[in-house]
UniProtKB/Swiss-Prot annotation:
EC number of this enzyme: 4.6.1.1
Protein name: Adenylate cyclase type 9
Family designation: Belongs to the adenylyl cyclase class-4/guanylyl cyclase family.
One cellular component (GO) term of this entry: membrane
Lineage: superkingdom: Eukaryota
A single GO molecular function term of this UniProt record: adenylate cyclase activity
InterPro entries membership: A/G_cyclase, A/G_cyclase_CS, Nucleotide_cyclase
Taxonomic lineage of the native organism: Eukaryota, Metazoa, Chordata, Craniata, Vertebrata
Residue intervals passing through the bilayer: 111-131, 135-155, 165-185, 210-229, 236-253, 275-295, 779-799, 811-831, 860-880, 884-904, 912-932, 967-987
Length: 1305
């Protein structure tokens, strides 16, 4: 097992960050996340991500836990500290955000022009109906403005607008300022007296007027300021300066140039109270505008980051998926791998937990489909007919490896088997495994193909040519002996750990025999295989009888006729990598269906490049292997591949296609990703380097963290920008959001439900406030601004009664007190929910969790947002026809609560309804006065004077013409309120969409992040089942892995009577292997126990289980107990015996018998292969451990003398067996465990004599004993390789001692 530090690099990692709020200081921590099933209420959820710039530390629980810092959060992730100019702290991000969000800005500006045009058109209609004398002076500027707006609208569709959008917005703003301020220049009429009755008579005589009341003009001012802050897209400081200047000029011109003939009843200058009150109203509208501006920028940039993260996560997802495919394809064929990955994609949660399926907690057998419990684990094994099987052995390998060190030996095997792996892909064969110096593969399995025999023949001939090239490059003298047979096989995977795809059948055994009885340099085929071939090959009789004798031919071949193939009749020599031996079949799918099109294209290009390499002369530019043939050149110019990666012996790394694609700055990320991931010839080193590189980039890009050095941050930002520019998701995201265009609900009902519950979930999780866009802090801002507006409006409404020393209405005072108390309490609760929620009592938190639900929160928010409007209505109901100036001010003040509905984005579904009700109520109060019996009086007198006015005034005012001002006032306010409602509706819609898009971006990023983590866990789990984790960590920094271990333990455990259980007549033996799979799965479950973490399963060889301990140096650092791992391995062997006994108790008619061999000592561990990786161990220690098994006694553990001396000191009692004959070692003393008791009987004498040299495998296969693997050639003390007794003796002994090999059938 890897150390905790190393484990964080790949498995269950999470990046968390603490930002200081200004984005200038970020600390990155990598925390270990325990693998546990999350409890989610719904499909969509938001979790704390590393990109959020978390500004606090979560409280760990208890009063003594760390408390979060209570400080103002940053505006948004990666924002600068300048709140008056919200922007990213990176120029790359800021420019990309402006560019990607430009379509949204452009669309909003067009809407603004359309709104201005509609407003101008409505006011033109109003003026044309009501004005008689100044028709031209009002209509001409308005019509000109409409034409200008139309021109700007069409200009936004040109490319020039993108370059001058800010200047255009500023020009339109100044134009609107000029036009609206011009209406304030109203000519004074000195001919009018100050007497109200005379003015009324004069007005009645003319019957016309040409100006707006202060309600209409103030509504225009409000609309202009809202447009300035929300859709003109000018910098905040510029918008604020322009807005303040506009407010000052608006009120100044309105105060000095008011036309007293506009409304006769409104005669009189502005009072000081009105001037101050209007100033407070402007403060309110500017506060609302600034808040809308900041939150719009915050949400747009946050959404940009979230969508960008989704894009990056999508790229990472593709990388992780391709990486997972390559890793899983290294242990099983594509068709089986695709089925497994499809199941993992459909059931991601199950795929994440797949590793736990082999844990001790899940001892009950799993069921994948049936609802009723079954006793077997999921098991897939197929019986396929017409499959060609190839076995190939290196002739002369013993002599070649005699003077090689272990590291050099692994390197040679890697180089040679790497060539075979590439050749296997080209010939469409499926590699099964390597057995020492033996290589075997199949064709037509698991995907049937009619040319399976040709594939194997081409593979065999290509291997012969490849080893010839190998000999010329390495100056060695070796050759290949190849055997091919065609028949029926069982194919599948056994076990739950360190699994590999394998084949079993008697025909597999016969193919192995073809290789043993073959001739070096030729392909030995059976008569059945020859029936599938035509005359394209040079075929001759094998002459087995003449070469080996009649007895051998009769006993082993049993009359089977065989042939030798020396080559093709028109065969063209191939390069050293043996490419393009057969043409690629039309319609062959070279790519995974799950990869993106650009990845498939890269595979096709790679395949095409392979076809160009056909002759030895072209070795200098072979694109598939990258090798250069230098037959006559110096030795240091020859390339060698170690650990699956190629390197120059001269020292400098060779530039490869993979390296070039990743290091070329001119290439796009997509193309480099495709080239990197689709080259099936990439080694494990390349795979791990890609995983480390892309996973690291994924963390940097998805989190967008300004890591400790500026250059790193700039590089990651530049890469982030480069990737999102090539993706259309950003544009589609803003133009085609996944929401209903009418109701603004998400199209996904489950997502809508999750959205409505998101606020409550955040309160329940006590999520820390990270940015202004956080749900709880956003609500706090809304409540704070609402209370601020409420206070200012209350003060403004109290100024008039205060100046007249008249007490305000009782209803208004009571309502003011109640509303003020409610607003203050809501503000306190919002502050506590945002910053101090964890400090509250449990019952209080439960109450807040309840009221934070969708319905309670909307009800409370509706009450709060209506408080300012309720206060104003209380004044209107009392003083409506008492003071017309005060009434008009209240009508103007009522515009502020209507605008304020834009702030509550979380209540946007009901905000428009509330604003509509408010405006409609105002119009009803104007058209249907509450006191119709009381005539409107002169505003210049006090209330008492108005009440004592003479009856003659009533008679004068009974004229119907006197109602015209109020009729026009109602119509004017109706137009003003309608336009304001239209603007509020537009802004509400835009902000609601942006708020939902921000949430959807969070969800998408979180789902991608979760899925990527799931795939990383799957890939990590697969990687652990290919090679040990500590080996994978080493291969990240080195191109090869081979390590000598001085003290490692090895066991071989065989089911000795499985051959009696195995029967091919029933379903081809499939159900027999199902039982074996169950037993091996039980052995694998033992390894899942933490106590056995130091034990590594090496492989299964038929019905033999091989495991070792002491292979991880980080777990063997306890100098006080250097042999502790041996005790653990021995305990594991004992428990295997118990598992077999328990398994036999569940068997109805058969009892398996387990035999275990134990040994320890020095050995060599390494990884060989490129496309099909194999972690294996070699050495005398492995050889003796295998002999301890093959010469052992059933139901007992046989240990060597050296292991006995170590184990007996640990308290284990052994029986001394005596000496047994071990090939290569002579007579060895062995010991048995457990020790026989007096009444337990002696071990039968016939078992003591068991010393088979030829053993038929339990599944009927004839295999190669691990003693004949190259492990037997490595001496324990010096790491050198033993020399054999001669090639003739080796041929004779190999035919006799193929007992059990590393997986041959």
């Amino acid at each position: 097992m890897a150390s905790p530090v190393n484990q964080q690099l790949l498995h269950h990692t999470e990046v968390r960050c603490d930002g200081s709020g200004d984005g200038s200081s970020v600390t990155v921590r990598i925390n270990r996340q325990h693998h546990q099933a999350p409890s989610r209420r719904c499909k969509y959820s938001i979790s704390s991500s590393c990109s959020s710039g978390e500004s606090g530390v979560k409280k760990t629980g208890g009063s003594g836990g760390a408390r979060r810092q209570k400080k103002l959060p940053q505006l948004f992730e990666r924002s600068t500290s300048n709140w008056w100019n919200p922007k990213f702290d990176s120029n790359n991000l800021e420019e990309a955000c402006v560019e990607r969000c430009f379509p949204q800005t452009q669309r909003r500006f067009r809407y603004a022009l359309m709104y201005l045009s509609v407003a101008g058109l409505l006011w033109s209609i109003y003026f044309s109906v009501h004005m008689k004398t100044k028709l031209v002076s009002h209509l001409v500027p308005t019509l000109c403005f409409l034409i200008v707006c139309l021109g700007f609208f069409f200009f936004t569709f040109t490319k020039s607008y993108a370059r001058h959008c800010t200047a255009i917005s500023l020009l339109v703003t100044l134009l609107v300022f000029t036009l609206t301020l011009a209406s304030q220049f109203q000519v004074l009429n000195p001919g009018l007296g100050s007497d109200s009755l005379s003015n009324l008579t004069s007005f009645s005589a003319t019957g016309s007027s040409s100006c707006l009341s202060q309600v209409g003009s103030f509504s225009i001012c409000v609309e202009v300021l809202l447009l300035l802050y929300t859709v003109m897209h000018l910098p905040l400081y510029l918008s604020a300066c322009l807005g303040v200047a506009y407010s000052i000029l608006f009120e100044t011109f309105g105060y000095h140039f008011r036309d007293e003939s506009c409304f006769v009843l409104l005669v009189g200058r502005m009072a000081h109270w009105e001037l101050l009150s209007k100033a407070l109203l402007h403060v309110c509208i500017h506060a609302i505008g600034v808040h809308l501006f900041i939150m719009s920028e915050v949400r747009s940039r946050s959404t940009f980051l979230k969508v960008g993260q989704s894009i990056m996560h999508g790229k990472d997802l593709e990388v992780e998926k391709a990486l997972k495919e390559r890793m899983i394809h290294s242990v099983m064929p594509r068709i089986i791998a695709d089925d497994l990955m499809k199941q993992g994609d459909d059931e991601s949660e199950n795929s994440v937990k797949r590793h736990s399926a082999s844990s001790p907690k899940s001892r009950k057998k799993k069921s994948s489909i049936q609802k009723t419990p079954i006793i077997f684990r999921p098991f897939k094994m197929q019986r396929i007919e017409q499959v060609s099987i190839l076995f190939a052995d290196i002739v002369g390998f013993t002599k070649m490896s005699a003077n090689k060190s272990a590291h050099a030996l692994v390197g040679l095997l890697n180089d040679l088997f790497g060539r075979f792996d590439r050749l296997c892909e080209e010939t469409k064969c499926e590699k099964i495994s390597t057995l020492g110096d033996c290589y075997y593969c199949v064709a037509g399995c698991p995907e049937p193909r009619p040319d399976h025999a040709y594939c194997c023949i081409e593979m065999g001939l290509g291997m012969i040519e490849a080893i010839d090239q190998f000999c010329q490059e390495k100056k060695e003298m070796v050759n290949m002996r190849v055997g091919v047979h065609t028949g029926t096989v069982l194919c599948g995977i056994l076990g739950m750990r360190r699994f590999k795809f394998d084949v079993w059948s008697n025909d597999v055994n016969l193919a192995n025999l073809m290789e043993q009885l073959g001739v070096a340099g030729k392909v030995h085929i059976s008569e059945k295989t020859a029936r599938y071939l035509d005359d394209r090959y040079l075929m001759e009789d094998s002459m087995v009888v003449e070469r080996l004798g009649q007895i051998v031919a009769a006993d082993q071949l049993k009359g089977l006729k065989t042939f030798l193939i020396s080559g093709g009749r028109t065969r063209v020599p191939s390069c050293s990598c043996s490419q393009t031996l057969i043409p690629v079949q039309e319609g062959t799918d070279l790519s995974s269906p799950s990869l993106a099109p650009h990845v498939q294209a890269a595979i096709s290009e790679t395949s095409d490049s392979h076809t160009n390499c056909t002759q030895p002369e072209t070795l200098k530019s072979c694109p598939s292997c990258g090798e250069t043939a230098a037959r006559d050149g110096p030795e240091e110019g020859v390339s060698a591949a170690n650990g699956g990666g190629e390197e120059w012996k001269g020292g400098a790394p060779r530039p490869s296609a993979i390296g070039a694609s990743l290091k070329d700055p001119e290439r796009s990320p997509e193309s480099s990703t495709g080239d990197t991931l689709t080259n099936s010839q990439a080694s494990l080193y390349d795979m791990l380097q890609e995983k480390g590189r892309w996973c690291g980039v994924s963390m940097d890009q998805s989190a967008l963290l300004p890591l400790r050095f500026k250059n790193i941050r700039e590089k990651t930002d530049a890469h982030f920008v480069e990737v999102i520019k090539e993706d259309s998701l950003m544009k589609d995201y803003f133009f085609k959001p996944p929401i209903n265009p009418l109701s603004l609900n998400f199209l996904d009902k489950e997502l809508e439900t999750s959205y409505r519950a998101s606020y409550q979930e955040e309160v329940i999780r006590m999520a820390p406030v990270k940015t202004f866009a956080s749900a709880t802090f956003s609500s706090l801002q809304d409540v704070l601004l609402n209370y601020f507006i409420f206070v200012l409006l209350s003060v403004a409404c109290l100024l008039k009664p205060g100046t007249n020393t008249v007490s305000p209405p009782t209803l208004a005072l009571v309502l003011l007190s109640v509303c003020g108390l409610l607003g203050f309490l809501s503000l306190l609760v919002s502050v506590r929910m945002a910053f101090y929620l964890e400090d509250m009592l449990l019952c209080t938190r439960r109450l807040l969790e309840i009221i934070s639900g969708w319905v309670p929160r909307h009800f409370i928010g509706t009450v709060l947002v209506c408080l300012p409007a309720a206060v104003i209505f209380s004044y209107l109901s009392s003083d409506f026809y008492t003071d017309i100036h005060y009434t008009m001010f209240l009508c103007s003040a009522l515009l502020i609560p209507m605008v304020q509905y834009c702030n509550f984005c979380q209540l946007s579904s009901s905000a428009l309804l509330l604003a509509t009700i408010t405006g409609a109520t105002m119009l009803i109060l104007i058209y249907l006065p509450l006191c119709p019996q009381r005539p409107p009086l002169d505003p210049g007198t006090d209330i008492e004077a108005n009440l004592s006015t003479s009856n003659s005034s009533y008679e004068t005012l009974d004229n119907p013409r006197t109602e015209l001002p109020f009729t026009r006032l109602g119509q004017e306010i109706a137009v003003a309120y309608f336009l304001l409602l239209l603007l509020v509706w537009f802004l509400n819609r835009e902000f609601d969409v942006s708020y939902r898009l921000h949430y959807h971006g969070d969800v998408e990023a979180d789902l991608h992040r979760t899925k990527i983590q799931s795939m990383r866990d799957q890939a990590d789990w697969l990687l652990r089942n290919i090679i040990p984790y500590h080996v994978a960590e080493q291969l990240k920094v080195s191109q090869s892995y081979s390590k000598n271990h001085d003290d490692a333990g090895v066991i071989f455990a065989s089911i000795v009577n499985f051959s009696e259980f195995y029967e091919e007549n029933y379903e081809g033996g499939k159900e027999c292997y199902r039982a074996l799979n169950e037993l091996i799965g039980d052995f694998d479950e033992l390894l899942s126990k933490p106590h056995y973490s130091c034990i590594e399963k090496i492989k299964t060889i038929g019905a033999t289980y091989m495991a070792a301990s002491g292979l991880n140096p980080s777990q063997c650092q306890d100098s006080s107990q250097p042999h502790r791992h041996l005790q653990t391995l021995f305990e594991f062997a004992k428990e295997m015996m118990s598992v077999v006994d328990e398994f036999n108790n569940n068997m109805l008619w058969f009892n398996f018998k387990l035999r275990i061999g134990f040994n320890h000592g020095p050995l060599t561990a390494g990884v060989i292969g490129t496309t099909k990786l194999l972690y294996d161990i070699w050495g005398d220690t492995v050889n003796i451990a295998s002999r301890m098994d093959t010469t052992g006694v059933e139901c007992r553990i046989q240990a060597s003398e050296e292991s006995y001396r170590v184990l007996v000191k640990m308290g284990y009692d052994f029986d001394y067996r005596g000496t047994v004959n071990v090939k290569g070692k002579g007579q060895m003393k062995t010991y048995h465990f457990p020790k026989c008791t007096d009444n337990g009987g002696l071990v039968p004498h016939h078992q003591l004599c068991i010393s088979p040299d030829i053993r038929v495998q339990v599944d009927g296969s004839i295999g190669r004993s691990p003693t004949d693997e190259i492990s037997s050639l490595v001496t324990g003390g010096k790491g050198a390789v033993e020399l054999g007794s001669g090639e003739a003796e080796r041929k004779r002994e190999k035919a006799e001692e193929r007992g059990r090999d590393g997986g041959a059938r």
